[in-house]
Amino acid sequence: MKIDYVSDLHINHWIPWNVNQIKWEKRTREIVNRLISNGNGEVLVIAGDFTEWNQQTLWVLDEAAKQYEKVYFTYGNHDLYLLSKSQKRKYSDSLGRLNDLIQKAADMKNVTPLIKTTETYKGKVFAGDVMWYLPKGIEGWDFFKGVSNDSNYIWLNGYNKVDGVRAMWKESMDWYETLENTQVDVFVSHVPPVHNPYSPFEPNTCYMVDVPFINAKHWVCGHDHLQAEFDKDGTSFHMNCIGYPYDYDNYPSVNVIPGEEVDSYKTFELKTFEI
């Protein structure tokens, strides 16, 4: 089985929200088709951080579902962001926004969210969740409070910022520990469980999550905006983060579909592995 994968689309930075919804939808679908044009797998995996707008995420999923037998996705931190007062009124809190996305995506017959769930597809076990991080030490919490936008745009009713992070981390961990005796073929998370050895940055507890075990053959993740594949302790890790337009040498203007040569290192396309 061939599996195409991608994460950290941040599509609203490439195709920003437009009061002209018809134009916004058309451009969004066009850039998705550009992104997946090199795909050749049966399954597409999207490891979170679609956009700050659910409607745009649904267009991404709908367009991808036209070309794949199965689309699996989990959510990222940006998929919880509430940027405006109207979003806060509409969703109440960040989990309200997530639940709205899950409910609407459920209408797409070959699209399946992996959010604290497992599913067997053609004999292969897929599992996934955001796998929320837990900042550690003064340095980790200072980064969360002073640098990370998560502390500004994620709202959980009944929790302050610190307790909200702890609660999301605990929910991820409680579920993950139930998989100890499950052999997983493909695990999908937004936050990686290991530090990327190709990363130019020092390890940061807001960009990875410690797990008690890893029993997946393949692990697709993102969050750190890097594109890399590496093996560690018998697991193959796959990262294909698209990230923001300004991360690319050939900075494409917003609302313009990227050409083939976008960067001397990064690519704007899917990557594939086989199981």
Curated annotation (Swiss-Prot):
Residue ranges of coiled coil: none
PANTHER family referenced in this protein's UniProt entry, alphabetically: [ACYL-CARRIER-PROTEIN] PHOSPHODIESTERASE PPTH, PTHR36492
Gene3D superfamilies for this protein: 3.60.21.10
Source species of the chain: Bacillus subtilis (strain 168)
Any GO MF annotation of the entry: hydrolase activity
Pfam families noted in UniProt: Metallophos
CDD domains per UniProt: MPP_superfamily
Intrachain S-S bonds: none
Entry protein name: SPbeta prophage-derived uncharacterized protein YotB
Domain of life: Bacteria
Family annotation (InterPro entries): Calcineurin-like_PHP_ApaH, Metallo-depent_PP-like, Pantetheine_PDE
